[in-house]
Amino acid sequence: MRPRRRGLAYHHTKPKGQLSQGHYPTTSNDGQRRKVGNSEAFQSFDIWKNLDRIRSTKKNAGQFIKGSLLILPMRTEDKQQFDECMDELHKYISKDILRCYPQKEQKDEGMLFYIVLKDFNILDSCFVLSVLLAFQKRLWMAPSEKSYFRVPKNINLTGSFYLPKNIETGRGHIITSYRREQPSSSIVEVGFNVVPDFQQFQVKACHVSKFMNELSNFFSQVEFGKCEANVINYFKREYNRTYSQISLALYELPLIGDGLFDIKSYISKTRPIIETSKAQMIKHISEMKAYNEISGLQGDQFPRQQRPLSNSPSSNSISSSQTIEAGATSYQTQPQRHAVNKPSNVLNSSNRHSGPKTFEDGRYSEGNKPGFMTQDEIKQHCIGTIKASMDAVKKKSSYQILKTYVRCPRQNYIDIVYQNLNDLRSKTNCNIVVLNLNNLHESQMWLESLNTTNYTIFAQAPHPSTIRVISIGGVGEYIVKALELILNILEH
Protein backbone atom coordinates (compact mmCIF):
# COMPACT_ATOMS: atom_id res chain seq x y z
CA MET A 1 0.00 0.00 0.00
CA ARG A 2 1.30 3.40 -0.95
CA PRO A 3 1.66 5.93 1.86
CA ARG A 4 -0.96 8.70 2.08
CA ARG A 5 0.11 11.84 0.34
CA ARG A 6 0.19 14.75 2.70
CA GLY A 7 -1.40 17.97 1.56
CA LEU A 8 0.52 21.19 1.21
CA ALA A 9 0.74 23.14 4.46
CA TYR A 10 -0.01 26.91 4.32
CA HIS A 11 0.67 28.87 7.48
CA HIS A 12 -1.57 31.88 7.91
CA THR A 13 1.00 34.02 9.61
CA LYS A 14 0.85 37.72 8.82
CA PRO A 15 2.84 38.47 5.68
CA LYS A 16 5.45 41.18 5.61
CA GLY A 17 3.79 43.19 2.88
CA GLN A 18 0.23 43.86 1.89
CA LEU A 19 -1.41 41.05 -0.04
CA SER A 20 -3.10 41.68 -3.35
CA GLN A 21 -6.82 41.18 -3.83
CA GLY A 22 -7.95 37.54 -3.53
CA HIS A 23 -4.67 36.20 -2.07
CA TYR A 24 -5.65 35.41 1.51
CA PRO A 25 -3.62 32.94 3.60
CA THR A 26 -4.78 29.34 3.39
CA THR A 27 -4.78 26.68 6.11
CA SER A 28 -3.36 23.17 6.08
CA ASN A 29 -5.43 20.02 6.37
CA ASP A 30 -2.89 18.49 8.80
CA GLY A 31 -2.59 15.31 6.73
CA GLN A 32 -6.33 14.69 6.71
CA ARG A 33 -8.23 14.05 3.51
CA ARG A 34 -10.22 17.12 2.41
CA LYS A 35 -13.97 16.56 2.34
CA VAL A 36 -15.81 18.15 -0.53
CA GLY A 37 -19.29 17.36 0.73
CA ASN A 38 -22.12 19.74 1.49
CA SER A 39 -20.64 23.13 2.33
CA GLU A 40 -23.40 23.85 4.85
CA ALA A 41 -22.21 20.97 7.04
CA PHE A 42 -18.78 22.57 7.44
CA GLN A 43 -18.34 24.54 10.67
CA SER A 44 -15.30 26.30 12.05
CA PHE A 45 -14.68 29.32 14.28
CA ASP A 46 -11.54 30.29 12.40
CA ILE A 47 -12.07 32.88 9.67
CA TRP A 48 -9.10 31.64 7.61
CA LYS A 49 -10.48 28.10 7.42
CA ASN A 50 -13.86 29.42 6.36
CA LEU A 51 -12.24 31.57 3.66
CA ASP A 52 -10.35 28.53 2.42
CA ARG A 53 -13.66 26.67 2.25
CA ILE A 54 -15.28 29.48 0.23
CA ARG A 55 -12.31 29.56 -2.13
CA SER A 56 -12.62 25.82 -2.80
CA THR A 57 -16.40 25.79 -3.31
CA LYS A 58 -16.80 29.04 -5.31
CA LYS A 59 -14.83 29.20 -8.53
CA ASN A 60 -15.40 32.95 -8.95
CA ALA A 61 -14.67 33.83 -5.31
CA GLY A 62 -11.50 35.72 -6.25
CA GLN A 63 -12.96 37.66 -9.18
CA PHE A 64 -13.92 41.25 -8.44
CA ILE A 65 -17.56 42.29 -8.90
CA LYS A 66 -17.88 45.16 -11.38
CA GLY A 67 -19.28 48.37 -9.87
CA SER A 68 -19.71 46.72 -6.47
CA LEU A 69 -20.34 48.93 -3.44
CA LEU A 70 -21.12 47.97 0.17
CA ILE A 71 -21.47 50.33 3.15
CA LEU A 72 -21.42 49.16 6.77
CA PRO A 73 -22.18 51.81 9.45
CA MET A 74 -20.48 51.01 12.76
CA ARG A 75 -20.69 52.75 16.12
CA THR A 76 -18.09 52.04 18.81
CA GLU A 77 -16.87 53.67 22.00
CA ASP A 78 -13.35 52.19 21.86
CA LYS A 79 -11.75 54.05 18.98
CA GLN A 80 -8.28 52.71 19.73
CA GLN A 81 -9.25 49.05 19.34
CA PHE A 82 -11.25 49.86 16.24
CA ASP A 83 -8.19 51.47 14.64
CA GLU A 84 -6.15 48.38 15.51
CA CYS A 85 -8.78 46.15 13.90
CA MET A 86 -8.77 48.26 10.72
CA ASP A 87 -4.96 48.11 10.60
CA GLU A 88 -5.14 44.31 10.76
CA LEU A 89 -7.67 44.26 7.92
CA HIS A 90 -5.53 46.54 5.76
CA LYS A 91 -2.68 44.05 6.01
CA TYR A 92 -4.70 41.66 3.84
CA ILE A 93 -6.84 43.98 1.74
CA SER A 94 -5.94 47.13 -0.13
CA LYS A 95 -7.00 50.57 1.13
CA ASP A 96 -8.42 51.27 -2.32
CA ILE A 97 -10.96 48.52 -1.68
CA LEU A 98 -11.56 48.95 2.06
CA ARG A 99 -12.07 52.53 3.23
CA CYS A 100 -13.18 54.06 6.51
CA TYR A 101 -14.98 57.41 6.89
CA PRO A 102 -15.31 58.66 10.50
CA GLN A 103 -18.27 60.75 11.57
CA LYS A 104 -18.13 63.55 14.14
CA GLU A 105 -18.40 62.13 17.64
CA GLN A 106 -21.63 62.88 19.52
CA LYS A 107 -22.11 63.07 23.26
CA ASP A 108 -22.86 59.72 24.98
CA GLU A 109 -23.27 57.94 21.63
CA GLY A 110 -19.74 56.87 20.70
CA MET A 111 -17.93 57.31 17.42
CA LEU A 112 -19.67 56.53 14.12
CA PHE A 113 -17.70 55.04 11.21
CA TYR A 114 -18.78 54.26 7.65
CA ILE A 115 -16.92 51.19 6.34
CA VAL A 116 -16.97 51.15 2.53
CA LEU A 117 -16.09 48.19 0.29
CA LYS A 118 -15.69 49.19 -3.35
CA ASP A 119 -14.90 46.96 -6.35
CA PHE A 120 -14.55 43.94 -4.08
CA ASN A 121 -14.88 40.19 -4.58
CA ILE A 122 -16.71 37.50 -2.59
CA LEU A 123 -13.69 36.74 -0.37
CA ASP A 124 -13.34 40.44 0.50
CA SER A 125 -16.97 40.73 1.59
CA CYS A 126 -16.86 37.53 3.67
CA PHE A 127 -13.58 38.52 5.29
CA VAL A 128 -14.46 42.15 6.18
CA LEU A 129 -18.06 41.59 7.29
CA SER A 130 -17.16 38.60 9.48
CA VAL A 131 -14.35 40.45 11.26
CA LEU A 132 -16.24 43.72 11.80
CA LEU A 133 -19.57 42.20 12.84
CA ALA A 134 -17.73 40.02 15.34
CA PHE A 135 -15.74 43.04 16.57
CA GLN A 136 -18.89 44.83 17.75
CA LYS A 137 -19.76 41.95 20.12
CA ARG A 138 -16.23 40.91 21.02
CA LEU A 139 -15.58 43.97 23.20
CA TRP A 140 -18.11 42.91 25.82
CA MET A 141 -18.97 39.26 25.01
CA ALA A 142 -15.40 37.93 24.67
CA PRO A 143 -12.93 40.56 25.91
CA SER A 144 -10.25 37.92 26.51
CA GLU A 145 -10.15 36.98 22.81
CA LYS A 146 -7.07 38.64 21.33
CA SER A 147 -7.36 37.54 17.70
CA TYR A 148 -9.57 39.49 15.33
CA PHE A 149 -9.72 36.51 12.94
CA ARG A 150 -11.43 34.03 15.23
CA VAL A 151 -15.12 34.23 16.14
CA PRO A 152 -15.85 32.60 19.54
CA LYS A 153 -18.81 30.33 19.99
CA ASN A 154 -20.71 32.76 22.23
CA ILE A 155 -20.69 35.57 19.64
CA ASN A 156 -23.51 36.00 17.14
CA LEU A 157 -22.97 38.02 14.00
CA THR A 158 -25.62 40.74 13.89
CA GLY A 159 -25.83 44.06 12.09
CA SER A 160 -26.89 45.72 8.86
CA PHE A 161 -25.13 46.61 5.63
CA TYR A 162 -26.36 48.67 2.69
CA LEU A 163 -26.20 48.13 -1.06
CA PRO A 164 -27.31 50.46 -3.87
CA LYS A 165 -30.93 49.94 -4.82
CA ASN A 166 -30.13 49.43 -8.52
CA ILE A 167 -28.71 45.92 -7.98
CA GLU A 168 -29.99 43.07 -10.14
CA THR A 169 -29.93 39.29 -9.79
CA GLY A 170 -29.85 36.54 -12.38
CA ARG A 171 -32.46 34.34 -10.67
CA GLY A 172 -35.26 36.55 -9.46
CA HIS A 173 -35.40 38.12 -6.03
CA ILE A 174 -32.40 37.54 -3.81
CA ILE A 175 -34.18 36.65 -0.63
CA THR A 176 -36.78 34.53 -2.42
CA SER A 177 -34.08 32.31 -3.94
CA TYR A 178 -32.39 32.09 -0.58
CA ARG A 179 -35.50 30.95 1.19
CA ARG A 180 -35.93 28.13 -1.31
CA GLU A 181 -32.53 26.75 -0.40
CA GLN A 182 -32.37 27.80 3.25
CA PRO A 183 -35.63 28.74 4.97
CA SER A 184 -33.87 30.20 8.03
CA SER A 185 -31.59 32.56 6.14
CA SER A 186 -29.18 34.68 8.16
CA ILE A 187 -29.33 37.55 5.60
CA VAL A 188 -32.73 39.21 5.32
CA GLU A 189 -33.81 42.14 3.19
CA VAL A 190 -35.40 44.88 5.28
CA GLY A 191 -38.83 45.94 4.06
CA PHE A 192 -38.59 49.57 5.17
CA ASN A 193 -35.56 51.47 3.86
CA VAL A 194 -34.40 54.33 6.06
CA VAL A 195 -31.87 55.61 3.49
CA PRO A 196 -33.27 56.55 0.07
CA ASP A 197 -31.78 54.80 -3.00
CA PHE A 198 -30.18 52.16 -0.77
CA GLN A 199 -31.36 48.71 0.23
CA GLN A 200 -30.72 47.56 3.80
CA PHE A 201 -29.85 43.94 4.59
CA GLN A 202 -29.98 42.64 8.14
CA VAL A 203 -27.60 39.94 9.36
CA LYS A 204 -28.61 37.45 12.08
CA ALA A 205 -26.13 34.57 12.10
CA CYS A 206 -25.34 32.16 14.93
CA HIS A 207 -22.22 30.76 13.27
CA VAL A 208 -19.57 32.33 11.09
CA SER A 209 -19.45 29.32 8.72
CA LYS A 210 -23.14 29.56 7.92
CA PHE A 211 -22.88 33.33 7.46
CA MET A 212 -19.95 33.09 5.01
CA ASN A 213 -21.65 30.35 3.02
CA GLU A 214 -24.86 32.35 2.62
CA LEU A 215 -22.99 35.59 1.96
CA SER A 216 -20.97 33.95 -0.83
CA ASN A 217 -24.16 32.64 -2.42
CA PHE A 218 -25.69 36.08 -1.98
CA PHE A 219 -23.00 38.00 -3.89
CA SER A 220 -22.64 35.32 -6.55
CA GLN A 221 -26.14 36.32 -7.76
CA VAL A 222 -25.78 40.12 -7.48
CA GLU A 223 -25.05 42.47 -10.38
CA PHE A 224 -24.40 46.09 -9.47
CA GLY A 225 -25.53 49.04 -11.52
CA LYS A 226 -23.80 52.35 -12.09
CA CYS A 227 -23.46 54.70 -9.09
CA GLU A 228 -22.90 58.43 -8.90
CA ALA A 229 -19.51 59.82 -7.97
CA ASN A 230 -20.70 61.34 -4.68
CA VAL A 231 -22.78 58.35 -3.60
CA ILE A 232 -20.82 57.89 -0.35
CA ASN A 233 -21.36 61.49 0.76
CA TYR A 234 -25.03 61.16 -0.13
CA PHE A 235 -25.35 58.03 2.01
CA LYS A 236 -23.60 59.66 4.97
CA ARG A 237 -25.86 62.71 4.80
CA GLU A 238 -29.11 60.74 4.51
CA TYR A 239 -28.14 58.19 7.15
CA ASN A 240 -27.20 60.89 9.63
CA ARG A 241 -30.42 62.81 8.93
CA THR A 242 -32.56 59.71 9.49
CA TYR A 243 -30.70 58.84 12.67
CA SER A 244 -31.16 62.38 13.98
CA GLN A 245 -34.90 62.23 13.35
CA ILE A 246 -35.19 58.92 15.18
CA SER A 247 -33.13 60.22 18.10
CA LEU A 248 -35.26 63.34 18.30
CA ALA A 249 -38.45 61.27 18.47
CA LEU A 250 -37.09 58.84 21.08
CA TYR A 251 -35.21 61.31 23.27
CA GLU A 252 -37.45 64.32 22.86
CA LEU A 253 -37.47 65.53 26.48
CA PRO A 254 -33.71 65.37 27.17
CA LEU A 255 -33.01 67.29 23.97
CA ILE A 256 -35.02 70.23 25.26
CA GLY A 257 -32.36 70.88 27.86
CA ASP A 258 -29.26 69.62 26.07
CA GLY A 259 -29.71 69.47 22.32
CA LEU A 260 -32.06 72.28 21.32
CA PHE A 261 -30.68 75.11 23.47
CA ASP A 262 -27.27 76.25 24.56
CA ILE A 263 -28.10 76.66 28.24
CA LYS A 264 -24.97 78.64 29.15
CA SER A 265 -25.46 81.27 26.45
CA TYR A 266 -29.20 81.37 27.15
CA ILE A 267 -28.58 82.07 30.86
CA SER A 268 -25.95 84.72 30.11
CA LYS A 269 -28.44 86.60 27.89
CA THR A 270 -31.46 86.37 30.18
CA ARG A 271 -29.78 86.88 33.57
CA PRO A 272 -29.30 90.70 33.16
CA ILE A 273 -32.93 91.09 32.09
CA ILE A 274 -34.18 89.10 35.07
CA GLU A 275 -31.99 91.03 37.51
CA THR A 276 -33.18 94.37 36.09
CA SER A 277 -36.83 93.33 36.36
CA LYS A 278 -36.27 92.11 39.91
CA ALA A 279 -34.68 95.42 40.96
CA GLN A 280 -37.53 97.40 39.41
CA MET A 281 -40.12 95.25 41.19
CA ILE A 282 -38.39 95.76 44.56
CA LYS A 283 -38.25 99.52 43.95
CA HIS A 284 -41.92 99.61 42.95
CA ILE A 285 -42.96 97.66 46.07
CA SER A 286 -41.02 99.99 48.38
CA GLU A 287 -42.58 103.06 46.72
CA MET A 288 -46.07 101.58 47.09
CA LYS A 289 -45.50 100.85 50.79
CA ALA A 290 -44.22 104.37 51.43
CA TYR A 291 -47.14 105.91 49.53
CA ASN A 292 -49.71 103.79 51.40
CA GLU A 293 -48.20 104.70 54.77
CA ILE A 294 -48.34 108.43 53.98
CA SER A 295 -51.90 108.14 52.62
CA GLY A 296 -52.97 106.19 55.70
CA LEU A 297 -51.62 108.84 58.06
CA GLN A 298 -53.35 111.63 56.14
CA GLY A 299 -56.61 109.69 56.04
CA ASP A 300 -56.54 109.20 59.81
CA GLN A 301 -55.92 112.90 60.48
CA PHE A 302 -58.81 114.38 58.48
CA PRO A 303 -61.71 112.41 60.03
CA ARG A 304 -60.46 113.13 63.55
CA GLN A 305 -60.47 116.86 62.88
CA GLN A 306 -63.99 116.86 61.48
CA ARG A 307 -65.61 114.30 63.80
CA PRO A 308 -67.27 115.93 66.86
CA LEU A 309 -67.08 114.46 70.36
CA SER A 310 -69.98 112.15 71.15
CA ASN A 311 -70.27 113.08 74.84
CA SER A 312 -70.54 116.83 74.28
CA PRO A 313 -74.15 118.11 74.16
CA SER A 314 -73.11 121.41 72.68
CA SER A 315 -71.36 119.74 69.81
CA ASN A 316 -74.40 117.57 69.14
CA SER A 317 -76.67 120.58 68.95
CA ILE A 318 -74.26 122.48 66.75
CA SER A 319 -73.80 119.57 64.37
CA SER A 320 -77.54 118.90 64.18
CA SER A 321 -78.28 122.54 63.43
CA GLN A 322 -75.55 122.60 60.79
CA THR A 323 -76.96 119.41 59.30
CA ILE A 324 -80.46 120.87 59.12
CA GLU A 325 -79.22 124.08 57.53
CA ALA A 326 -77.13 122.18 54.99
CA GLY A 327 -80.05 119.91 54.23
CA ALA A 328 -82.40 122.80 53.74
CA THR A 329 -79.95 124.54 51.46
CA SER A 330 -79.39 121.42 49.39
CA TYR A 331 -83.08 120.64 49.08
CA GLN A 332 -83.88 124.13 47.86
CA THR A 333 -82.13 123.23 44.62
CA GLN A 334 -84.36 120.20 43.94
CA PRO A 335 -87.01 120.48 41.19
CA GLN A 336 -90.35 121.97 42.10
CA ARG A 337 -92.24 118.73 41.52
CA HIS A 338 -90.53 117.10 44.50
CA ALA A 339 -91.63 119.91 46.75
CA VAL A 340 -95.26 119.65 45.57
CA ASN A 341 -95.70 115.90 45.52
CA LYS A 342 -94.15 115.05 48.91
CA PRO A 343 -93.32 116.92 52.12
CA SER A 344 -89.81 118.23 52.69
CA ASN A 345 -87.24 115.70 53.86
CA VAL A 346 -85.77 118.31 56.16
CA LEU A 347 -89.05 118.64 58.04
CA ASN A 348 -89.46 114.91 58.23
CA SER A 349 -85.97 114.39 59.57
CA SER A 350 -86.19 117.25 62.10
CA ASN A 351 -89.64 116.32 63.36
CA ARG A 352 -89.00 112.59 63.39
CA HIS A 353 -88.77 112.33 67.18
CA SER A 354 -91.03 115.23 68.09
CA GLY A 355 -94.16 113.12 68.32
CA PRO A 356 -96.92 111.72 66.13
CA LYS A 357 -97.92 113.69 63.10
CA THR A 358 -101.41 113.52 61.55
CA PHE A 359 -102.44 114.11 57.98
CA GLU A 360 -105.77 115.60 56.89
CA ASP A 361 -107.47 112.18 56.83
CA GLY A 362 -106.64 111.73 60.53
CA ARG A 363 -104.12 108.85 60.07
CA TYR A 364 -100.89 108.97 62.03
CA SER A 365 -97.59 109.12 60.16
CA GLU A 366 -94.65 106.82 60.85
CA GLY A 367 -92.43 109.70 61.90
CA ASN A 368 -92.71 108.64 65.53
CA LYS A 369 -90.88 105.35 64.88
CA PRO A 370 -87.21 105.60 65.94
CA GLY A 371 -84.74 104.88 63.10
CA PHE A 372 -87.36 105.11 60.38
CA MET A 373 -86.06 106.34 56.98
CA THR A 374 -87.95 106.95 53.80
CA GLN A 375 -86.85 105.40 50.51
CA ASP A 376 -85.37 108.69 49.37
CA GLU A 377 -83.39 109.00 52.60
CA ILE A 378 -82.08 105.46 52.20
CA LYS A 379 -81.04 106.29 48.66
CA GLN A 380 -79.21 109.43 49.75
CA HIS A 381 -77.43 107.49 52.48
CA CYS A 382 -76.30 104.82 49.98
CA ILE A 383 -75.03 107.51 47.60
CA GLY A 384 -73.04 108.94 50.50
CA THR A 385 -71.38 105.58 51.21
CA ILE A 386 -70.41 105.27 47.52
CA LYS A 387 -68.83 108.74 47.40
CA ALA A 388 -67.04 108.19 50.70
CA SER A 389 -65.67 104.87 49.42
CA MET A 390 -64.44 106.57 46.26
CA ASP A 391 -62.50 109.12 48.31
CA ALA A 392 -61.05 106.39 50.54
CA VAL A 393 -59.87 104.39 47.51
CA LYS A 394 -58.38 107.45 45.78
CA LYS A 395 -56.20 108.12 48.82
CA LYS A 396 -54.50 104.77 48.26
CA SER A 397 -52.31 103.66 45.39
CA SER A 398 -54.12 103.10 42.10
CA TYR A 399 -52.26 99.79 41.68
CA GLN A 400 -53.10 98.43 45.13
CA ILE A 401 -55.52 95.51 45.36
CA LEU A 402 -58.44 96.47 47.62
CA LYS A 403 -61.88 95.30 48.68
CA THR A 404 -64.60 97.87 49.28
CA TYR A 405 -68.23 97.70 50.39
CA VAL A 406 -71.14 100.05 49.61
CA ARG A 407 -74.85 100.04 50.44
CA CYS A 408 -77.63 99.93 47.85
CA PRO A 409 -81.40 100.32 48.39
CA ARG A 410 -83.21 97.01 48.26
CA GLN A 411 -86.28 98.53 46.63
CA ASN A 412 -86.00 99.16 42.86
CA TYR A 413 -82.23 99.69 42.63
CA ILE A 414 -80.77 96.33 43.68
CA ASP A 415 -82.70 94.63 40.87
CA ILE A 416 -81.08 97.00 38.36
CA VAL A 417 -77.65 96.17 39.80
CA TYR A 418 -78.39 92.46 39.45
CA GLN A 419 -79.37 92.94 35.80
CA ASN A 420 -76.15 94.83 35.03
CA LEU A 421 -73.84 92.73 37.20
CA ASN A 422 -72.06 90.94 34.35
CA ASP A 423 -71.71 94.20 32.44
CA LEU A 424 -70.17 95.87 35.49
CA ARG A 425 -67.67 93.04 35.93
CA SER A 426 -66.59 93.09 32.29
CA LYS A 427 -66.17 96.86 32.14
CA THR A 428 -64.21 97.18 35.38
CA ASN A 429 -62.43 93.82 35.63
CA CYS A 430 -63.49 93.70 39.29
CA ASN A 431 -65.12 91.00 41.36
CA ILE A 432 -68.53 92.50 42.17
CA VAL A 433 -70.78 90.46 44.48
CA VAL A 434 -74.03 91.24 46.33
CA LEU A 435 -73.60 89.94 49.88
CA ASN A 436 -76.11 87.75 51.68
CA LEU A 437 -77.05 87.96 55.34
CA ASN A 438 -74.63 85.19 56.30
CA ASN A 439 -71.55 87.11 55.05
CA LEU A 440 -72.77 90.61 55.78
CA HIS A 441 -70.46 90.91 58.79
CA GLU A 442 -67.34 91.22 56.60
CA SER A 443 -68.46 94.67 55.39
CA GLN A 444 -68.94 96.12 58.87
CA MET A 445 -65.36 97.30 59.40
CA TRP A 446 -65.15 99.09 56.05
CA LEU A 447 -68.54 100.81 56.35
CA GLU A 448 -67.83 102.00 59.89
CA SER A 449 -64.56 103.59 58.73
CA LEU A 450 -66.30 105.73 56.10
CA ASN A 451 -66.96 109.42 56.80
CA THR A 452 -70.33 109.96 55.10
CA THR A 453 -71.16 113.27 56.83
CA ASN A 454 -69.48 115.22 54.02
CA TYR A 455 -71.80 113.71 51.39
CA THR A 456 -75.20 113.19 53.05
CA ILE A 457 -77.19 114.44 56.03
CA PHE A 458 -78.51 110.92 56.64
CA ALA A 459 -75.45 109.48 58.33
CA GLN A 460 -77.25 106.82 60.38
CA ALA A 461 -77.31 103.31 58.94
CA PRO A 462 -80.67 102.16 57.57
CA HIS A 463 -82.30 98.98 58.76
CA PRO A 464 -80.59 95.89 57.23
CA SER A 465 -83.86 94.76 55.68
CA THR A 466 -84.07 97.91 53.56
CA ILE A 467 -80.63 97.72 51.94
CA ARG A 468 -78.19 95.27 50.35
CA VAL A 469 -74.40 95.46 50.60
CA ILE A 470 -72.30 95.23 47.42
CA SER A 471 -68.71 93.95 47.63
CA ILE A 472 -66.18 95.22 45.06
CA GLY A 473 -62.69 93.70 44.88
CA GLY A 474 -59.88 94.54 42.50
CA VAL A 475 -57.22 97.12 41.64
CA GLY A 476 -57.73 100.62 43.01
CA GLU A 477 -58.29 102.47 39.74
CA TYR A 478 -60.79 99.84 38.54
CA ILE A 479 -62.68 99.96 41.84
CA VAL A 480 -63.17 103.73 41.38
CA LYS A 481 -64.63 103.07 37.93
CA ALA A 482 -66.98 100.42 39.34
CA LEU A 483 -68.15 102.80 42.07
CA GLU A 484 -68.84 105.47 39.45
CA LEU A 485 -71.00 103.05 37.45
CA ILE A 486 -73.00 102.02 40.54
CA LEU A 487 -73.38 105.68 41.51
CA ASN A 488 -74.71 106.41 38.02
CA ILE A 489 -77.37 103.71 38.51
CA LEU A 490 -78.55 105.27 41.78
CA GLU A 491 -78.55 108.86 40.55
CA HIS A 492 -80.32 108.18 37.27
From Swiss-Prot:
GO terms for cellular component: commitment complex; nucleus; spliceosomal complex; U1 snRNP; U2-type prespliceosome. InterPro entries: Snu56_snRNP. One of its GO terms (biological process) is mRNA 5'-splice site recognition. Residues 1-15 have a biased composition (Basic residues). Residues 18-30, 329-353 have a biased composition (Polar residues). Residues 1-35, 300-371 are annotated as: Disordered. Keywords: mRNA processing, mRNA splicing, Nucleus, Ribonucleoprotein, RNA-binding, Spliceosome. One of its GO terms (molecular function) is mRNA binding. It is found in: Nucleus. Residues 310-321 have a biased composition (Low complexity). Pfam families: Snu56_snRNP (PF19097). The keyword Ribonucleoprotein applies. Component of the 18S U1 snRNP particle, a subcomplex of the spliceosome. Interacts with the nuclear cap-binding complex CBC1-CBC2 (yCBC). Directly contacts intronic sequences of substrate pre-RNA. Present with 361 molecules/cell in log phase SD medium. Component of the U1 snRNP particle, which recognizes and binds the 5'-splice site of pre-mRNA. Together with other non-snRNP factors, U1 snRNP forms the spliceosomal commitment complex, that targets pre-mRNA to the splicing pathway. This is 56 kDa U1 small nuclear ribonucleoprotein component. The lineage of its organism: Eukaryota, Fungi, Dikarya, Ascomycota, Saccharomycotina.
